[in-house]
């Protein structure tokens, strides 16, 4: 439900969303997660149950992957940086578009680092005209 509030507030979407895949990761000391993106989904998220000070997730702008003119700004910000660092703290959830390249820096502590990641797709009516479709799903119910 928290993600649907996020999608309504920031993207103005009215669709419901479902989690299609999820997994837990353990990063041992010195482990790193190199740049990657997620396929077959629209949004992704990651939950950080416990992190140490200075932990972050790094997003790389798509434009960084193509040859282009590169001006030297007098200061870097979200718009002119190739990478955007998002600092996280214990209990944080970060949502992002699944196509965005992202990485997790080396675990420089002597303890394991854990996170839970997940992917979303929209349900209901999506698209327009001859590209429109309707996605349904069955909710799992416990007795």
Regions found by a protein language model. Name each.
Residues 20-22, 43-45, 114-118:
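Hydrophobic residues positioned within well-ordered beta-strands of beta-sheet architectures
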